[in-house]
Structure formats: structure tokens, C-alpha cells
């Protein structure tokens, strides 16, 4: 047999091994029938594997899209976002050294800084107030009210994330004080975190009723309830 034809046949067989689906084309029907008449089988395994490989990314993309794409049940929730702002991204503020030694003299110095900070706040000098409250915190980092006061200034500066950090610290020191919950509730409201805002403002009113906190609670609570009800409805749909 012509060696050239043998080489061509060898190349063709190699190609068929790589992609047996070639044997399933109409023009190769005669060869497929001959293979089967000899007791062999001409499967499409390689082709199907190739198709699977080609289809898998599409399937994966489709699954990802389905996961990322909110269902009609999720996307039909409309909440009034009036007053919601973009989150602040400043580096975390100084929190002081909680292991610092605090003498009576240091406490007096911290109190002087606090008084000066409140005066600056009353004069509308917000950044000066922040700086003075920070000085007070560095002197007495275990006094919850200092963090709550500084948080109130951060809220005025529309820096809710900074306010939340201060409130978290204040609550860690004294979890029974109303002020940190009130400030944190206001900060969450600025970010559109309705459920968190409602939770904190409700606690603030529970610890020490405040008309301002109560008024804001009445504003955010319907939105928080709407979200909670929507989530329950969505979960029931998924369980079905």
C-alpha cells in the first residue's frame, strides 16, 4: 500500500480518536457502518465532551446571572430613599488606648477637653469639636459618653460610618446607655439601613425616651417593616 496513503489514513484515524463525531457526518456514514459491521461502535463521546466543555461556561454564566439577577419578588420592593447619602470612606478615627493609665488628673484634663468640644459644637465649629473630643478620648478612652458625643458630630458632618464606629465602642463600654443607640440609629438612617436604624432607635427610646429618637423611629419603622415583610414573603416563595 502506498506509504503516503498509510500516513494519511493514520492521520485520519488520529483525528477520529480526537473527535469521533467526525464518523457521524453524512459523508462518513459508509465508514461508520463498516466499523459497526465489524462489531465496533462509533460513539460521539469526544464531541459530547467538547460540547459539555463549551456549554459549561455558558451554564455557569447562566447560573451566575440567575444568582446575581434579583427575582421579580426581590426587585419589586420600593423604598423611599430620601435623605440617604453615600457612605463615608475615611480611615478609622483614633479610639485611644483602652489600657492607658487614667489618673484623676488625666480625667480632669479629659473633662476640660470635652467641655471645650461642646462649646465648639455649639458654635458650629464641627471639625474643631471632633478634634477636641478626640483629645478627650485619648486621655480617657474608657468613657462611653465621649464616643457618643463625637458620634453626634460625625452625624452632623454626614459621616455615618465614623459615627457607627464610635457608637459601637460606646456600647461596648456601656451597653445600657441610650445615646449611642440614638446616634447609631441616625447614622444607619443616613445609610438607608432601615432595619438597623429601627432596632437602634427603638432601644434608645426603651433606655431613655427621647422625642427626637421617637420621631425618627416613626419615620424608619414602616420601611423596616416593609423590608421584613417582603423578606418573609420571598422566603415563603422559595420554600414553595
Swiss-Prot record:
It holds the Pfam family TPR_8. One of its GO terms (molecular function) is protein dimerization activity. Residues 38-94, 220-240 are annotated as: Disordered. This is Putative protein FAM10A4. PROSITE patterns: TPR, TPR_REGION. TPR repeats lie at residues 110-143, 145-177, 179-211. Its main location: cytoplasm. GO terms for cellular component: cytoplasm; extracellular exosome. Keywords: Cytoplasm, Repeat, TPR repeat. It comes from Homo sapiens. Belongs to the FAM10 family. CDD domains: Hip_N. Residues 46-69, 226-240 have a biased composition (Basic and acidic residues). It is found in: Cytoplasm. PANTHER family: HSC70-INTERACTING PROTEIN (PTHR45883), PROTEIN FAM10A4-RELATED (PTHR45883:SF3). Residues 85-94 have a biased composition (Acidic residues).
